Design a protein with these regions (language model features):
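Patatin-like phospholipase
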Residues: 1-37, 45-286
Length: 286
């Protein structure tokens, strides 16, 4: 049976995911495919390039850099997370992304974004970690209201989390059968309807289908989490999630809080490492 690693978004809650991934890298845990949404895509690419420690390193180092994430960046560029800094200067110069290792890794890597024209999810299979792949990763993490939409491959895209919390359903639809799922909220979390009605109305003027998708986002999220839970009960999935809500804001500027979220993920992965190995080994035998 083909295995897939599934990564939820959640902005800086993604440091939990980074902790899990680095334990996987340290212990040679591998999958046939991996997929991420939003922060799950932005940080998950380091699992494919096998760069253990990179994501927590640069996030702690630059979390207070206004070019990385700041209201000033939002006012100046239209992006809360500075696009040029995050997707060019950082991976090309400041903390180089290993594109060669990414391209040579046989694990397939998928990222999901939301099509502004339809309000539906669209997915991209990355190839070499180059400019096109990074444009899709940026699109996957382009949060509405605080990011420009990304135009790529005939689409105008925003954050994948508008539609899909994780790529679980998509990966299942293309033939993957066993899943390790990394969530960034505790099990049983129920998403409530967003109170940002005014922002949705403003968005409706430019992207009416996105506004419609946001209006039912909580329903889609909760239904997806239920499907994942049922898959776990059926023995088709194994879920890692924080035991308690993570003490990090979406745009967290405290490096110690980022480290604690990372350490929480690493501890969860170490505790479940034998169970994960057994689950993946069983998948090879089925």
């Amino acid at each position: 049976m083909k295995t897939a690693l599934v990564m939820e978004g959640g902005a800086m809650r993604g440091m939990f995911t980074c902790g899990v991934l680095d334990v996987f890298l340290e212990n040679g845990v591998e999958f046939d495919a991996a997929g991420g949404i939003s922060a799950g895509a932005a940080f998950g690419c380091n699992f494919i390039s096998r760069q253990r420690g990179r994501a927590i390193r640069y996030n702690k180092k630059y979390c207070n850099d206004e070019n990385y994430c700041s209201v000033r960046s939002l006012i100046k560029t239209g992006d809360l997370y500075g696009a040029d800094f995050c997707y060019r200067e950082l991976p090309d110069v400041l903390d180089p992304f290993d594109r060669k290792a990414f391209a040579e890794n046989t694990t397939e890597f998928y990222v999901g974004a939301t099509d502004t024209a339809t309000g539906k999810p669209v997915y991209h299979k990355c190839s070499d970690g180059g400019e096109r792949d990074f444009a899709w990763i940026r699109a996957s993490a382009s949060m509405p209201f605080v990011s420009h939409a990304v135009v790529i491959d005939g689409y105008t895209l925003l954050d994948g989390g508008i539609c899909d919390a994780t790529p679980f359903d998509y990966l299942k639809s293309i033939g993957y059968e066993r899943f390790v799922v990394i969530l960034t909220r505790p099990r049983g979390y129920i998403k409530k309807k967003s109170p940002s009605a005014l922002f949705s109305k403003l968005l409706l003027r430019r992207y009416p289908e996105i506004a419609k998708a946001l209006a039912i986002r909580h329903e889609r999220y909760n239904a997806e989490m239920l499907r994942i839970a049922r898959s776990e009960e059926a023995g088709e999935a194994l879920v890692l999630a924080p035991r308690e809500p993570l003490d990090v804001k979406r745009s967290e500027h405290d490096p110690e809080k980022l480290q604690r979220a990372y350490d929480t993920g690493a501890a969860e992965a170490r505790e479940k490492l034998d169970e994960i190995r057994a689950f993946l080994q069983q998948s090879k035998l089925l």
